[in-house]
Amino acid sequence: MGQEQGTPWILSTGHISTQKGEDGQKTPKLEHHNSTQLMGHYQKTMNQVVMPKQIVY
C-alpha cells in the first residue's frame, strides 16, 4: 500500500516541477529544495501511515 500512496506524491511533485520549470533559472535550485522537502514529507507520510496501521493490527 505504501507504494500506491507514493505514486500520487510523485505525480504532485512532477506538476510542481513543471510550474517552476517556467522560471528556468530557479528550476535547478528549487529542484534541490524539492528533493530535500520530498524526502522529509515522504518520511513523515510513511510514519503517519505506519502508525495507524500498527494500531489497527
Swiss-Prot record:
Q: Where is the composition biased (Basic and acidic residues)?
A: 20-30
Name the GO terms of the biological process aspect. Answer: symbiont-mediated suppression of host cytoplasmic pattern recognition receptor signaling pathway via inhibition of MAVS activity
Q: Tell me which GO cellular component terms the UniProt record holds.
A: host cell cytosol; host cell nucleus; membrane
Matching InterPro entries: Flu_proapoptotic_PB1-F2 (IPR021045)
Localization per Swiss-Prot or TrEMBL: Host nucleus; Host cytoplasm, Host cytosol
Segments for region (Disordered): 1-30
Pfam families cross-referenced by the UniProt entry: PB1-F2
UniProtKB keywords: Host cytoplasm, Host nucleus
Q: Which family is this sequence assigned to?
A: Belongs to the influenza viruses PB1-F2 family.
| Miscellaneous comment | Is not encoded in all strains, and seems to be dispensable for replication.
**What does this protein do, in the record's words?**
May play an important role in promoting lung pathology in both primary viral infection and secondary bacterial infection.
- Supply the name of the protein: Protein PB1-F2
